[in-house]
Amino acid sequence: MEKVCNAKIKYSYLGLDENGSLVIQLGFDCELGTVQTNRTDIIDAYFIQEILNTLELNRWEDLPRKYARIKVEGNRVIAIGNLIEEKWVKL
């Protein structure tokens, strides 16, 4: 079942996995506890830009300690949204 909640971004990771593929991961603290994204498939600059634009930020390094809305299924974040506006990025 999908749940929506406000969350604080606890950490952000942008790097390469053992195969050299670009990986991102975001951890969130919310009423459901600590949850995280699990995006390890093809990631490009457009996807990263979409996250930053949705959260109205200019730099990946600014993500920790910012607030967002998240959609959670189980313990996995499936979408990240703007806290005020109806803007979402599906993961």
Language model segments and positions:
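Short beta-rich binding modules
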Residues: 1-91
